[in-house]
Amino acid sequence: MEKDISRKIDLLNILIEEKRWFTLFELEKNLNCSSKTIRKDISIINDLLPKTIFIHSKKGKGVKLSLPQNQSISEAISNLLKKSLTFLAIQQLLEERSNTVTSLADKLYLPISSTNIVLKRVSKYIKKFGLSLEKKPLRIVGDEFQIILMFSERYLESYPDTEWPFTEYKEEMLIDYINYIEEKLEIVFYSNDKRRMAFIMTILFKRIKQGHKVKFSEWIIKETMESIYYKKIFEGKNVIKVNKNRSLNIEEQVLLVIMVKLSRYVSKDENNLKQEELVLYKEGESTTYTYVKNFISILEQELKIDLNNNEEFVYGMIEYCREAFHILKFIPILKAPEKDTCKYIKKHYEETFYLVKRAYNKWGAEMKLTDIPDEEIAKVTMRIVAIGKQHNINRKKVLLITGEGKSWEEYMKSRINKRYGDQLKFVGGHAKILNGNTDNIDNIDIDFIITTVPLNFSWKSIVYVSPILQERDFYEIGIFASK
């Protein structure tokens, strides 16, 4: 990403941390630039912000972000990312409109020398996904599944909300396909996971049309086709098609099933499902639950705490292991960049992280899992940390919606409860809200929603917060908690 765009995003992230005036000296020091550059950045950012959000700059006071509690800065950040030459180059590579450096330079209105600098940034970005860039012809090479993941993640960063970037495929058609998957599996995807599925599907269709092929090992294909997910979605009539004359082949179907398993969703009958799974776990007859029980036992030995009698923790680990085992066993090629949330946990809970890592590696050896990434260790660490911070005497009913995964969601709950534990009670995900069906939202038994992702509806009681909670976020939550 270009330095000027990165700096503007950093400026926004600094201003959103706290609801106060920041001095120009503070900002100069944090951003390593002059006050003149900061004022210029503020002017550009204000043009990108919605009318209700504004960055004030006053002599003698400094700089302050005016942000209503029911809005976020995601629109401004996505607008900045769309202007990034790195993204524009990746966009051209997806469309396969430029097969030489010269033709790409013409598309970007840049000299050859500047285009080569942009391509170096592209190479650095895609390397995190195990991919590389070839110049003759100009193209991205590597595992096709990773290529699709890379394109979808980059597009989601630039189009996180409601704007649809793919003109040749109607969004309504993709959403219909995803609704069909939800209906067959009796689930509701989280809103940002539903959007990710739509992007994955569209990019898959585009790549198929361009002649690219998805490949998996025979073992992955066999395991996936035997799963209940595959049988419910694809056995029977072929509903999901690239076009009216082209159905998905087996490996393309497998890719979509894998993405469903890696997505976050809620069951339409979540409470009954939870109780059924806990009963099966306690009976210990299924190997699936035996694996989870062994993991929890190893964690207890390393951490010297009781975990097996905590039903919330056990059920959370059942959910987690189902996804993690699939990632580590079936898709060892995933090489996504480390998230800020992972870095945060490693820094602030170093000892717990180390003990969980030791336990995870022991369990991994038993399960023949190799190269367990820190991202997965951090997810389990978050669940351990959350146990000691949760309280049950709460009042206001709150729904928390995040885009960072279930483990981080539990950790966020624990941090909010630590501050407002005697005032709030977190409730389970409501399928209607996640599905965007909000006609009767006022009749749902919640007092307000806390979310880290943009929602596709308006409501009087929504608090937008950062994934790593800041003082500004606690202040906004406190307003609703005190009402």
UniProtKB/Swiss-Prot annotation:
Keywords: Activator, Capsule biogenesis/degradation, Plasmid, Repeat, Transcription, Transcription regulation, Virulence. The keyword Phosphoprotein does not apply. It comes from the Bacteria. GO terms for biological process: regulation of DNA-templated transcription. Induction: Transcriptionally regulated by AtxA. Transcription is also positively controlled by carbonic acid and CO(2). It holds the Pfam family HTH_Mga. PROSITE patterns: PRD_2. Residues 165-270, 283-394 form the PRD domain. Belongs to the AtxA/AcpA family. AcpA has a larger effect on cap gene expression than does AcpB. AcpA and AcpB regulate cap gene expression and capsule synthesis. This is Capsule synthesis positive regulator AcpA. It comes from Bacillus anthracis. The gene is acpA.
